[in-house]
Structure formats: structure tokens, C-alpha cells
Amino acid sequence: MAAKDVKFDIDARNRMLKGVNILADAVKVTLGPKGRNVVLDKSFGAPRITKDGVSVAKEIELEDKFENMGAQMVKEVASRTNDEAGDGTTTATVLAQAIVKEGMKSVAAGMNPMDLKRGIDLATSKVVEAIKSAARPVNDSAEVAQVGTISANGESEIGQQIADAMQKVGNEGVITVEENKGLETETDVVEGMQFDRGYLSPYFVTNPDKMTTELEDAIILLHEKKLSSLQPMVPLLESVIQSGKPLLIIAEDVEGEALATLVVNKLRGGLKIAAVKAPGFGDRRKAMLQDIAILTGGQVISEDLGMKLESVTIDMLGSAKRVSITKDETTIVDGAGAKAEIEARVAQIRNQIEETTSDYDREKLQERVAKLAGGVAVIRVGGMTEVEVKERKDRVDDALNATRAAVQEGIVVGGGVALIQAAKHLDGLEGANNDQNIGINIVRKALEAPLRQIAENAGVDGSVVAGKIRESSDLAFGFNAQTEEYGDMFKFGVIDPAKVVRTALQDAASIAGLLITTEAMVADKPAKEGAGAGGGMPDMGGMGGMM
């Protein structure tokens, strides 16, 4: 086992804080409408330019192992916020840095770290309550566009595209983002269906960068039972190979020998294939398989109907223009099903919605209608160069996630103002002791950090802006960094999804609390140069006389 390097107390915390600051300082320059770009070097291809906080965070790896631990913990804040809310990663990073900085100062001054953490947790839950109660629902398409615009760093075209897409497929519909070959960004609505089952093996992945499986012009086998052996399917698989088209298997499960055989065939390149579990459970699974069959123009292979795998022919399978599979979701786009049959199926499900008395069943049936009728909207992002397209696609992804979050939990005042207004709810909050009160004050101070950073990125003194907003009794009063004006943020259209603001604070406080309470750090000692050359023969001199 390699020797370990151990750091304690102040030395450990200082090293960690340095790492936190390096990562946060690189990420926070992107915050706000006047945030700057960060250029990321790639080992192959052109450098990538981005304003996406989590993309910047993911690239950072520090040489000093102790500093790197601090950086990796804050990277975790950005990643978690991105996974939960899809946006707000830079805000979360700025909040985490502010809490850690103040917390470390207090620990160095002799405060109890555990009490500080308890104070931070108390304050965070109080502020989260305030954000939730301040949220109001999204009223119309214009507000959806405003949320998207803010998240896309002020580009109104992106906000409008997302609002249009949401209008076309509804809030239940599925929206995906792709790169366009041309200069324009356009929105297409394609008939399609998405369900929450991912690939059964990562070996099916065709795009390792995104860890997705993309099948173009695919054939789809729908099987109601488990597949544990492929022997009955051999004639069918031979027909599929002859057709040259990729195959998607949707079954209750594909396990053991069957899965191993598919993976081996995929790796050898003989068969373009992927397998996913069927969505739903019990009777609902049967119904959803039937939905997919109607959408793709195929049949469900069911033993109840006397169908055996041995007798299945290729014309009994469904087909779709494109299938995209991630580890969690499968999207079938442009199925070959007849329009009249799809409409009849939708009408049938709508009748069931009217008849059902269970709220849960009604919700699930409505989801099925959305998947059959709503389709998939595809936003194709264009640009002059590949670098520009990738940068814009990052922003469209963020904006899309933000608008979804806004529809889920409502909107609050944007530009960091919601956090400052929520801080007023901490005024009467008392901890069990003085150290906990200091923890509460750490959060109170940290809540101003995003607004200050937005102002500073716009070239304005952050403390002056924060002071003005703190003094105002109008909850919507704020600073529009785009126009450098003070006023009603709702009228300016500067709004944030409540879910994004809430998640950013919760994740930041959670990780910052862990960092503050760290007392020791352990890392591998760096290997000494030339240590790998041991065991060779010593001096070889004097062997010349052996001839």
C-alpha cells in the first residue's frame, strides 16, 4: 500500500480553501448577463468556449492533492445542482465558496465547527421555506420565454424558441436539443415517445462522449416476457443482420446468456443492437407496450395471444426513424405507425381518463396521451463555427432545464434578489448557542454573494448594489445587470425558477457544511522520481572481457 500524506487542522483547511477558491473563481466569472466566457482546452479538436458553470467545473483538476480535494467537493455542488435542477450551477458554486470562506474564518477564530454547521442548516431550511412561499406559478408563454432568456445569458431568441417548443408539445411533451448544420436555430416537432428506461448494458453505447445510444432507421422488437436465451430468436436475428438495420429490443428484461450474446455481437460489430426494459409494471406495462407497438407499426409478441418467438418474422416488428437511449431514458422518434391508428388509440385512452376515479391512474393515462399525441420537439442549434454551436447548445440546454424547473415549482425574482429578500426571514431566527447564531449569519452574508458577483461581472460595485436592495421594502425591487437599471424585476423580465434557486442553496450549504467540519485530510504521497527502476542489474561494466 502506498504511503499516505496526512494534513491536520489549519493546514488542511487552508489547502482545501485554496482549491475551493481556484475552482469557484474560474466558474463565477460566467455569472449573470454580462458574465465572461471561459476557454477549455481539449486534448483533440478546437478549444471549447462556454458560459456553463458545470462545464468549467468539470474541467478543473489541481496538481496539489489537498487543494484538489477542496476543488472536487465544490465540483460536486455544481454537478448535483445540474442533476437536480439542470441550471443554477454557477450560483451554487458562488454560494458554496461564500459559506466556506466565512465558515473557515470562524473555525480559525475558535468557533465549534459542528455548531456552525447546525446554524448553517437551520438558516438554509428557513430560507428554502421563504423561497418556496415567494414562488408564483408561470402564467403564460411570455414568462416561459423570459426564464429561458435569463438562463441563456440574456439571448432572447433562445428563450423564445423554448417557449414556442413548450407551446407545441405542452408541458408534458419532450424537448431535445441537437446541433444544426446551418447557421439558424430552428425548432421541429417530431412525433415520438419517451419513457424512463435506459440501456441494459453500457456496452450498447454508440456515442461515448454523451454516453448515449443512437440508432438510425431502427427495427423494434416488443416482447412481453423475459429473454434469457436468444436461441428461439436466431432466425429473426439473421433476417435483421441481412436488412442491415439496427435492432432495439424492448422486453420485460433481457438477462444472463441473452444479454451477454447481444453485447458480444455488438462489440464484434456484427449486429447494431440495444436492449431496454419495457416501461411500467403489470397491466400498465402491457398497455404501454401496446402504445409503442401502435406508434411504431409493430406487434407485441405475447404468449397470451399464442405468439412464439420462433415464429416471429421481421415484418411483425415495429420501426422508427431514430431511437436515442441514455442510461435513464429511451426516446423513439418518428415511428412508422399509421396516423389513424395512433389517433384511435389516443381517443381510447381519453375515454379511460374520463371513466377513471383514481387520481394516480388519471395522471398516468394523461402521460400516455402526451407521449402518443404530444410528440417530441427538437431544437436544432446553429452557428457560424463548431465552437460557437457547442457554446450556444450549452446555453440552450441550461435554458430548457430552467424553464422546466419554472413550470414545476414556479418563479421568483431573478438576479440574486430572491436570496437577499429571503435572508430577511432570518431576522428572528436564533440558534441554541452563539456558535449556531454565527452559522446563521454566515448564510445571511453568503446569500448576497450571487447578486454581488452578477453586479461585479457587469462592472458595478457589488456592495453598493446589495446595500440598495437590502434597504428596499419592495420584494421585486432589484438591479438589472443587462441595462444597469434599478426597478421591478418582474417588469424587467428578470425571473428565476424557484427550484433552481432553492436547489443551488441546498446543495451549496450541504457541501460547505462538510468542508467546514473537516479536521484531517489523507492523500497518497507523490511517488519519488525514478522509483520504478528498482530490481534491475547494477553496474554492467567490465563484461567486455567475456568473449
From Swiss-Prot:
Task: Quote the cellular component terms of the Gene Ontology held in the record.
Answer: cytoplasm
- CDD domains, alphabetized: GroEL (cd03344)
- What functional role does this protein have? Together with its co-chaperonin GroES, plays an essential role in assisting protein folding. The GroEL-GroES system forms a nano-cage that allows encapsulation of the non-native substrate proteins and provides a physical environment optimized to promote and accelerate protein folding.
PROSITE patterns linked to this entry: CHAPERONINS_CPN60
Describe its partners and assembly state: Forms a cylinder of 14 subunits composed of two heptameric rings stacked back-to-back. Interacts with the co-chaperonin GroES.
UniProt GO molecular function: ATP binding; ATP-dependent protein folding chaperone; isomerase activity; unfolded protein binding
Q: Which family does it belong to?
A: Belongs to the chaperonin (HSP60) family.
**KW Cytoplasm (keyword) present:** yes
Protein name per UniProt: Chaperonin GroEL
- Reaction(s) this enzyme catalyzes, per UniProt: ATP + H2O + a folded polypeptide = ADP + phosphate + an unfolded polypeptide
Binding site residues for ATP: T30, L31, G32, P33, K51, D87, G88, T89, T90, T91, G415, D496
Q: Which Pfam families match?
A: Cpn60_TCP1 (PF00118)
Species assigned in the record: Dinoroseobacter shibae (strain DSM 16493 / NCIMB 14021 / DFL 12)
Please give the residue ranges the record annotates as the region Disordered. 528-547
**SUPFAM superfamilies in the record, alphabetically?**
GroEL apical domain-like (SSF52029), GroEL equatorial domain-like (SSF48592), GroEL-intermediate domain like (SSF54849)
Q: Which GO terms describe its biological process?
A: protein refolding
